[in-house]
């Protein structure tokens, strides 16, 4: 086995295959305190507790037409997680916000996704945060194709996951410890469906792997699960804010059997805003001739959310 010096190592590393490089537009690394556009340089120290312990926070943002959606809401949730984990970023919150805008500008495109990751930092392979003298910060701008009209018109298929909801003390922290979510994504692939959805021990609706879900119930109300064992996403919260102009909104436990009598089932994400779920466990959602197709609330909320987020998004 060869033993390389630093120059030879870096040359070999830069020449090695880099899957996913085409998706990375620009990134910031607090260790260097600069932005780079070469995906080969996007590297994480293996002894950062983010890597081997999941001791880190992250946020997924999207930007459209040169505006970052819900930036302040994402930062507020990151601060909440920071308090819960006693994990501060290696800069001030104002500086972190400015770095996000810097990376968005450096992406060279007016639409894409952004990931913000705050880790415990490098320092060892133990579990105690005390061995990490400085936290880490990475901000990455990603290439992201906009959802097509065909995607929205077709809708999504969903099913009840075998994975239980996260425990209450973990559910509201957006950490990088995402193994249950990975299991849910694997379930969906194995079953040939789009979305796995959790249910608690009492049969109440939880969330999808990387999205919130809700229903338009038989009475025509937008119903969202209680926030006790889910992570309320920025798109769902925005939908609850603007939806009362269209229909009543309630937050309450949603029983699994209600899905089969619901008018619509909805999925909320930062990237696609609001998408109708057309089938659950192989059965069409909705009643009458329009059953099994995304309904008017899904379409209306998607348009309203896009309008709201473009109007309130942070320009860069």
Identify the residue ranges that each predicted region occupies:
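Short, glycine/charge-rich beta-strand/loop segments that flank catalytic centers
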Residues: 92-101, 111-126
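Short secondary-structure junction motifs
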Residues: 109-113, 193-194
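Helix-start/capping segments and mature chain N-termini
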Residues: 1-90, 98-102, 128-316
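Phosphate/pyrophosphate-binding loops at sites that engage ATP/ADP/AMP, CoA/4′-phosphopantetheine
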Residues: 104-108
């Amino acid at each position: 086995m060869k033993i390389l010096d630093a120059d030879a190592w870096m040359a070999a590393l830069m020449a090695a295959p880099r899957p996913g490089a085409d998706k990375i537009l620009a990134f910031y690394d607090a260790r260097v305190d600069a932005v780079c556009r070469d995906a080969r340089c996007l590297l994480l120290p293996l002894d950062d507790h983010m890597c081997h312990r999941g001791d880190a926070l992250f946020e997924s943002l999207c930007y459209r037409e040169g505006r970052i959606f819900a930036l302040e809401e994402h930062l507020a949730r990151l601060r909440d997680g920071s308090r819960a984990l006693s994990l501060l970023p290696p800069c001030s919150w104002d500086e972190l916000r400015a770095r996000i805008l810097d990376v968005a500008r450096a992406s060279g495109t007016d639409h894409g996704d952004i990931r913000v990751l705050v880790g415990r930092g490098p320092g060892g392979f133990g579990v105690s945060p005390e061995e990490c003298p400085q936290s880490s910060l990475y901000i990455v701008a990603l290439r992201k194709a906009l959802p097509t009209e065909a995607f929205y018109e077709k809708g999504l298929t969903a099913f009840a996951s075998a994975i239980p909801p996260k425990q209450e003390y973990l559910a509201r922290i957006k950490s990088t410890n995402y193994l249950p979510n990975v299991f849910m994504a694997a379930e969906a692939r194995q079953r040939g469906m789009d979305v796995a959805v959790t249910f608690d021990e009492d049969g109440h609706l939880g969330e999808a792997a990387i999205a919130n879900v809700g229903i338009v119930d038989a009475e025509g109300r937008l119903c969202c699960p209680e926030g006790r064992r889910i992570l309320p996403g920025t798109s769902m919260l925005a939908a609850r804010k603007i939806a009362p102009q269209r229909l009543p909104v309630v937050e309450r436990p949603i029983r699994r059997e209600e899905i089969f009598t619901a008018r619509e089932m909805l999925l909320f994400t930062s990237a696609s805003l609001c998408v109708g779920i057309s089938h659950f466990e192989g059965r069409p959602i909705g009643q009458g001739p329009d059953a099994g197709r995304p309904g008017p609330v899904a379409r209306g909320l998607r348009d309203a959310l896009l309008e709201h987020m473009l109007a309130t998004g942070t320009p860069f």
